[in-house]
Amino acid sequence: MPNPNVGMMYPVFAPLVSHTDGSMPTYGAGVVIQEARNATVSKTYNENPLYGDDRIVDDDNGMTALNISFEPTGLSDSDRVLLFGETLKGNVGGITAQVEMDNETPYGGFGYVRKMRDHGTYSYEAWITLKVKFTEESQTTATKEQNISWNVPTLNGRAAALDIDGSGKLSWRIHYSFTSASAAKTWLNTMLNVSTATT
């Protein structure tokens, strides 16, 4: 049976610089985005059965879309520039303000580590979505009451598939399983161009 997922850590995003069919994409400098709370991946499959002799004789059920809902503990100003393409605009009320503008949201690679458990033994799966762009479609702000309400951002990402091996088949994500969290993080750092000085 599949190992149950018992944790998540180390969310990383790197801007997509270029991609040529048949090769892995090239990424700019990646960063670790705060701490991870959860990520939900949803997939859409094509359902197009071929009927013959009053029955299904074949079916085209390839994946047509992949979406990610990601919840970090928060976003820094630099995270928002990287993820959403926000810009700095000078002399706004006498200061340089960060502005949400009608900019194109950039594509990038997004990765994280899934902690797995199998009868007391832990493993660490590093997952990378190769090409995805995120939006923050809502923002909740609330007054403080008797107990603090932790209003954290929810990012919605739509992925695009890439030909990374010349086969003509499109890939959405890659992953590898490691016996330690540090090894999984090191692989993400390598793949998504994260400097160890920033982690």
Report each predicted region and the residues it spans.
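Polar/acidic, low-complexity leader/linker segments enriched in S/T/G and N/D
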Residues: 1-40, 198-199
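N-terminal "mature-chain" segments and other terminal, solvent-exposed stretches
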Residues: 44-53
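Oligomerization/assembly interface segments of phage tail-like spikes and tubes
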Residues: 55-79, 149-162
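Exposed beta-sheet edge/beta-hairpin loop segments within beta-rich domains
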Residues: 61, 97-103, 118-120, 141-151
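Ordered, amphipathic secondary-structure segments that act as subunit-interaction surfaces
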Residues: 63-104
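Beta-strand elements of well-folded, non-transmembrane domains
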Residues: 72-76, 114-118, 133-136, 159-163
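Short helix-loop boundary/capping segments
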Residues: 101-137
